[in-house]
Each structure stands twice: as structure tokens, then as C-alpha cells.
Amino acid sequence: TSHIARNLGEKLTMEQCLYAVMLESANECAYAVAEHVGQKLGGDYRTFIDRMNKRAKELGCTDTHFNNCNGLPDEDHWVSAYDMALISAEAYKNETFRMIAGSPSYTLPKTNKCKAEYPCHNHHKMIYPFRGDSSHLYKYCTGGKTGYTTVANNTLVSFAEKDGITLVCVVMDAATPVSYTHLTLP
């Protein structure tokens, strides 16, 4: 699983956790956010997951059931590409989400348990030249999220804006992180 090696009792802000989740797929931060929000809703971690499922239904999702907060394989957890596009389009309406999802990088500051800063980098190759590879940068890409599990393979949500139009693209079950390198974008 992906993580940023945070320690029990370490103090991070919600914003710092969201950057860690979106840029580094930090599962420990995803769980911390879910537990915190679930408690704010008067419950616990499961309360957060139940709220995710309720919100998905409100958005019109018909082929989605969340059973965890990080998307790791679970036989009672699934989402279709169409439903992920609905969820992503709704998330994109939020200014904070757009800022985080479109950030090439972010540095977590020192904390009460970690005496060094932690650099986070967006793994979305249209946003950040990950590992020095700038061949996939796309100037109209405004954000996105990569993902990978052995069950789901490579997944990608991308946002792009051009000529006043915002596009949401969802790719699931890709064999490699760069499956479509033979295509060019205008």
C-alpha cells in the first residue's frame, strides 16, 4: 500500500492530509481523514464510508459501493468509470479540491513526530514531470489523480480546461501507467 510513513500521534492539518492523499496516495492519511470526519458527523470511520455511499447515490451513481476510504481491493468495494466521472466532476466544483488535485508538488512541514520536511509530488504525468519525464506534460491539464492496485491495475482521473470547456476523463484497468503514448493531444 502507499503511505508517507506517518507515526501514531503525529499531528497534521486536514489540508496536509489531503495533499498527502491526493499526491502520494497516503493511505494512513486517508484513514485519519475518514476517522476525523466520521467523528465530526457523530460516528466513526464507518459513518464516513456510509456518507460516501449516500453522496454517491445523490450524484446519480448506480454502479458504486464504497467499503473503505482508499480504494484498496475489497470484494464489497467497487466503482464504475462512469460513476467515478460523476463523483470527480462534483469534486472538481470545489476550489480546494481543484487546488490540491492540480498541484505539481507540496511539502509537508516538520511535525511533532517528524523532524524533517516531506516532499510530495503529483504522480500524474500530465501535471508533473514525475521522475524527470516531461514527455507527457499537457498544458490544459488542470488536475487529476493516479491510482494502482493489483486488482484494478492502473487508474487515472484527469481534468482539463480549454476554450471554456472543462473535461473529466476516467481511465480504469490500464495495463501500464502510460498505455496511450501513441496518441497525441491537440
Locate each region found by the language model.
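Domain-terminus/edge residues, biased toward the C-terminal soluble/receptor-binding domains
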Residues: C61-T62, P73-W78, Y82-L183
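Active-site-adjacent loops and short helices of periplasmic peptidoglycan-processing enzymes
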Residues: T1-Y82, A91-E95
